[in-house]
């Protein structure tokens, strides 16, 4: 289901637990050896949920939050493909490797295509995460060769390694 403001605390807790710190090490998506600090904040998730161009989708088992994913619709430029950016994609580390992420990503793509008529999905992945890049490649995403420096945000996170970079991956949807 789509997230609402009442879900913010649970989303922030799950995202930070899955990406950073010791709790993230039980899953394969940890960034604990790459980054210190938080992955997200209450303010960021509230802003995303409140935005009309964003969907935060939740995966629940009864009331247990298993995963979430954020889709942000890019403003369409004349004759360009309509694009949705995927981010803050997470599955509880204790529940990973059970197909939840595959199903959540597929449902997010389906929903974005239905609601926004999306023709291309984009995301940014840390270049030193080959296992994560491979996961997305198996789902039809391709490396674009577009690489950028990892963003600096010392109030929230701090890189443990110098020279971190992000690569843009994309998936074009045939109509």
Question: Can you describe what each PLM-predicted range is?
Answer:
Residues 91, 97-110, 134, 138:
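Conserved acetyl-CoA-binding loop-helix of GNAT-fold acetyltransferases
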Residues 16-45:
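Conserved GNAT-fold acetyl-CoA-binding loop/helix
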């Amino acid at each position: 289901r789509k997230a609402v403001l009442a879900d913010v605390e649970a989303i922030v807790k799950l995202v930070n637990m899955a990406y950073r710190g010791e709790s993230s090490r039980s899953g394969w998506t940890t960034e604990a050896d790459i980054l210190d600090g938080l992955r997200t904040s209450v303010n960021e998730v509230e802003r995303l949920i409140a935005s009309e161009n964003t969907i935060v989708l939740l995966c629940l088992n009864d009331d247990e939050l298993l995963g979430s994913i954020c889709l942000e619709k890019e403003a369409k430029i004349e004759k360009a493909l309509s694009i949705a950016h995927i981010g803050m994609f997470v599955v509880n580390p204790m529940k990973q490797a059970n197909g939840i992420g595959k199903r959540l990503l597929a449902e997010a793509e389906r929903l974005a295509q239905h609601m926004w008529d999306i023709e291309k999905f984009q995301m940014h992945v840390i270049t030193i995460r080959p296992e994560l890049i491979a996961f997305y490649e198996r789902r039809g995403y391709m490396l674009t060769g577009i690489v950028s420096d990892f963003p600096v945000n010392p109030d929230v996170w701090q890189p443990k390694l110098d020279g971190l970079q992000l690569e843009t991956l994309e998936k074009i949807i045939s109509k």
